[in-house]
């Protein structure tokens, strides 16, 4: 059930409400929607290879209790947990809309697939710890009758983060928080670094932190396929198309400062079909904005950020596409099979790729050097000028590396504080966010999906309190800053 409320912690004199009271009323006729659902027998789909994605070009249903905008792992995870947790409540119709059915520009497929617990915020650490458990037990969560077990090709390997003298104190503080949250992390001095990793040049390194458990990398395509396969077996609908419009109703309410605000509710989603001028209207009760780098555009369709500047109604979702390059190189004299994922003091990073003396890595550009995100073309000069010099300094063997290939992908970059946006919008009361993770959305998707589903079904976060990631922080100017973003 969904309760009529104003959102948690609006501040600045607005009527406040806690997520735990979000149920019923205000055009969100949950009981009515659920009562319309007719039980259908879904045939169990056999498994297919991880790189084969099913056709989803058919029309969406005319009504769906929940419409998930975005079919990457974050959107799929929300859909999975909605179906998994609502077993106690009866049937729920869920539709996932994805405009790029090949996932050629999706952040999921272009990710390097890493998972790490070495964050500065307890919430991010908790999310990644849960994700590690989810991935380790993937076939308990995503098993499908008559389908072969999933193999995520997980490579257990710690993350090795290097800190300069000016960042050493912050690293010590971060590791203390990580240990308090249950992460297995240790600090290493330069001498300890040289003993364990003799191929590292420790010049400029004052301290390092090293993950000893639940870190590594995996195949994001197999996770994507496994989620889609499981969701289809659970009766979730998929549609290839683009969301172009929301039909809403509104209601005016007074704040405690005698200021009028407009509450909106989305009743209908218009989906433009691929290669067509036609659109299909889908009646709905809930919309999940998991559109990744383009989630701000979806939010704007609902009027978010269209009000006067400085007001809650005028507060935009601060998420935009940022292009990031990944380079793959060959170096027979490189560090070898025991190479962790290394994050250098310069911001450059690298890890082993496979067993053939190949490595991959990159570096986030400086703010003033951000590349044009209009396309996914690779800037090879960026590697030569901004990445390779740091790699060769840290690992002298990399002076002779040869670049083999490269690609570019998108971060759903939160320009406000580089952290995720999770939960309901305070004024568009039935739009929920799962976006803005700025590069760590893939690894935290299982926990984020569960949190959003809990908020919808229970009215509050149940397992991990992600209240610091609510939308209202943008209006209040209260940053939830994560310091460890690569």
UniProtKB/Swiss-Prot annotation:
Under the heading Gene3D superfamilies, the entry gives: D-Amino Acid Oxidase, subunit A, domain 2, FAD/NAD(P)-binding domain
Broad class of the protein's primary localization: mitochondrion
What are the TM regions of this chain, as residue ranges?
Answer: 66-86
Keywords attached to this entry: Electron transport, FAD, Flavoprotein, Membrane, Mitochondrion, Mitochondrion inner membrane, Oxidoreductase, Respiratory chain, Transmembrane, Transmembrane helix, Transport
Q: Which InterPro entries match?
A: FAD-dep_OxRdtase (IPR006076), FAD/NAD-bd_sf (IPR036188)
CC cofactor: FAD
Recorded hits in Pfam families, A to Z, give: DAO
Q: What is its EC number?
A: 1.-.-.-
Q: Which GO terms describe its biological process?
A: mitochondrial respiratory chain complex I assembly
The places in or outside the cell where this protein is found are: Mitochondrion inner membrane
Q: What class of enzyme is it?
A: oxidoreductase
GO molecular function term, any single one:
oxidoreductase activity
What's the subunit arrangement here?
Associates with components of the mitochondrial respiratory chain complex I.
Function according to Swiss-Prot or TrEMBL:
Required for the assembly of the mitochondrial membrane respiratory chain NADH dehydrogenase (Complex I). Involved in mid-late stages of complex I assembly.
Q: What is this protein called?
A: FAD-dependent oxidoreductase domain-containing protein 1
Protein's organism: Macaca fascicularis (Crab-eating macaque)
The uppermost taxa in this organism's lineage are: Eukaryota, Metazoa, Chordata, Craniata, Vertebrata
Gene designation per UniProt: FOXRED1
């Amino acid at each position: 059930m969904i309760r009529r409320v104003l959102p948690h912690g609006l501040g600045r004199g607005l009527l406040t409400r806690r997520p735990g009271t979000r149920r019923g009323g205000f055009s969100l006729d949950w009981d009515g929607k659920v009562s319309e659902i007719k039980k259908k027998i879904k045939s169990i789909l056999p498994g297919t290879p991880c790189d084969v994605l099913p056709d989803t070009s058919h029309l969406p249903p005319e009504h769906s209790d929940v419409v998930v905008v975005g079919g990457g792992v974050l959107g799929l995870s929300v859909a999975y947990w909605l179906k998994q947790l609502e077993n106690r409540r009866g049937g729920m119709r869920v539709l996932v809309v994805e405009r790029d059915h090949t996932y050629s520009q999706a952040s999921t497929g272009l990710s390097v697939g890493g998972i790490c617990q070495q964050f500065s915020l307890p919430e991010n650490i908790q999310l990644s710890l849960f994700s590690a458990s989810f991935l380790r037990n993937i076939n308990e969560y995503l098993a499908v009758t008559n389908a072969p077990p999933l193999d995520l090709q997980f490579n257990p390997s710690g993350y090795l983060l290097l800190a300069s003298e000016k960042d050493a104190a912050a690293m010590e503080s971060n590791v203390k928080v990580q240990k308090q949250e249950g992460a297995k992390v240790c600090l290493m001095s330069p001498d300890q670094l040289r003993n364990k990793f003799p191929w590292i040049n420790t010049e400029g390194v004052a301290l390092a932190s090293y993950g000893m458990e639940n870190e590594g990398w995996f195949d994001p395509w197999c996770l994507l396929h496994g989620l889609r396969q499981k969701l289809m077996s659970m009766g979730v609908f998929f549609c290839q198309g683009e969301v172009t419009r929301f039909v809403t109703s509104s209601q005016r309410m007074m704040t405690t400062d005698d200021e009028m605000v407009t509450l909106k509710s989305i009743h209908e989603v218009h989906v433009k079909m691929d290669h067509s001028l036609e659109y299909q209207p889908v009646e709905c009760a809930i919309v999940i904005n998991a559109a990744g780098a383009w989630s701000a555009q979806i939010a704007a369709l609902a009027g978010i950020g269209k009000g006067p500047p400085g007001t809650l109604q005028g507060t935009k979702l601060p998420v935009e596409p940022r292009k990031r390059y990944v380079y793959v190189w060959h170096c027979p004299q490189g560090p070898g099979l025991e190479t962790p994922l290394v994050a250098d003091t310069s911001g450059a990073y690298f890890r082993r790729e496979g067993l053939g003396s190949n490595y991959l890595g990159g570096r986030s550009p400086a703010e003033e050097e951000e590349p044009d995100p209009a396309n996914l073309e690779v800037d090879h000069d960026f590697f030569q000028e901004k990445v390779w010099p740091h790699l060769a300094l840290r690992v002298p063997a990399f002076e002779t590396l040869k670049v083999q290939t490269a690609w570019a992908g998108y971060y759903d970059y939160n320009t406000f504080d580089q952290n995720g946006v999770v939960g309901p919008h305070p004024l568009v009361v039935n739009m929920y966010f799962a976006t803005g993770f700025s590069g760590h959305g893939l690894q935290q998707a299982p926990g984020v999906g569960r949190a959003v589903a809990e908020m919808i079904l229970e009215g509050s976060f149940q397992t991990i309190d992600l209240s610091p990631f609510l939308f209202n922080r943008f209006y209040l100017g209260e940053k939830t800053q994560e310091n460890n973003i690569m």
